[in-house]
Amino acid sequence: MARRDDLTNKGPMSGNKRSHALNATKRKFNLNLQKILVTLENGSKVKIKVSAKTAKTLKKQGFVA
């Protein structure tokens, strides 16, 4: 199961974990993925996996059931 937004196709980003001594080790920044129920224009409902930011936008536009 890929950690990717179904609508915007955004995925995890890479970066560095920094200790107090500023040693750098690689890490991954994952998305805050949520499963939401979206109502399509024809009235059918679909469950999709989107980031929290996308879910907030869909809710504001009135697509979330």
Swiss-Prot record:
GO terms for cellular component: ribonucleoprotein complex; ribosome
Single biological process term from Gene Ontology: translation
Organism superkingdom: Bacteria
Ranges of biased composition (kind: Basic residues): 17-26
Region described as Disordered: spans on this chain: 1-26
Keywords noted in UniProt: Ribonucleoprotein, Ribosomal protein
GO molecular function annotations of the record: structural constituent of ribosome
Ribonucleoprotein keyword on record: yes
NCBIfam families per record: L28 (TIGR00009)
Family, per entry: Belongs to the bacterial ribosomal protein bL28 family.
Name recorded for this polypeptide: Large ribosomal subunit protein bL28
Organism lineage: Bacteria, Bacillati, Mycoplasmatota, Mycoplasmoidales, Metamycoplasmataceae
